[in-house]
Amino acid sequence: MCTAITIRTSQGNTCFGRTMDFSYPLDPELYISPRGYEWNNLAATHRIRSRYSFIGAAQDLPPVIFADGVNEMGFAAAVLYFPGYAKYDDSGSGDIPEDPRPPIAAIELVSFLLGLCASVRQAASMLDTIRIV
């Protein structure tokens, strides 16, 4: 199970840290995603264009999957492993009505948020516009 922590300094700056306790060994490398980078979601239903550049630890599976990172606006995000607790939309069950929101796979959520959001508030609003699958 992964752990994340934020610490606010006496100067008002925020520092972010995390552990990478996944169920399988990761071989992450440092990757940079440029502003304006375009990619298709894993469902291949939507083309996404990043507003912000970002840097983080990622693995080229392919595609390149970011475990964490920070963008040019200072917004940070991370994938945390919570076995048995995380639940996502099961769009393959046939019981879910047609949903017009773009499906974003859990493993591409960090890239999606870092590329499109400048703040936690903006990321929270963005989550209402997508379907995490």
Label for each model-derived stretch:
Residues M1-R101:
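A contiguous strand-loop segment
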Residues E98-V133:
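Proteins synthesized as precursors that undergo proteolytic processing into mature forms
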